[in-house]
Amino acid sequence: MVTIRLARHGAKKRPFYQVVVADSRNARNGRFIERVGFFNPIASEKEEGTRLDLDRIAHWVGQGATISDRVAALIKEVNKAA
């Protein structure tokens, strides 16, 4: 099953997440199909905290991909801000 989920990157105590489309059997930070955005939980006011390619996310959902709870919350937040 294909899922849209977060992959953790960044340094210790300074997380940075890539929003990726991946097979659910692969490791969290392992092989992925496509990168569709990022999420920086510790971004300052001047920095961009979240960027999502909503067109590609809609494409993958149309193909049958499931969305993780956290990514669904991020999509809702981005849609509310726009």
Swiss-Prot record:
Annotated InterPro entries: Ribosomal_bS16, Ribosomal_bS16_CS, Ribosomal_bS16_dom_sf
Keyword annotations: Endonuclease, Hydrolase, Nuclease, Ribonucleoprotein, Ribosomal protein
GO cellular component terms given for this protein: cytoplasm; cytosolic small ribosomal subunit; small ribosomal subunit
Biological processes per GO annotation: cytoplasmic translation; ribosomal small subunit assembly
KW Lipid metabolism (keyword) present: no
Entry coiled-coil feature ranges: none
GO molecular function, one term: DNA endonuclease activity
SUPFAM superfamilies per record: Ribosomal protein S16 (SSF54565)
PANTHER family in the cross-refs: 30S RIBOSOMAL PROTEIN S16, SMALL RIBOSOMAL SUBUNIT PROTEIN BS16M
NCBIfam families from the UniProt entry: S16
Subunit structure: Part of the 30S ribosomal subunit.
Full protein name: Small ribosomal subunit protein bS16
Species annotation: Escherichia coli (strain K12)
Gene behind the chain: rpsP
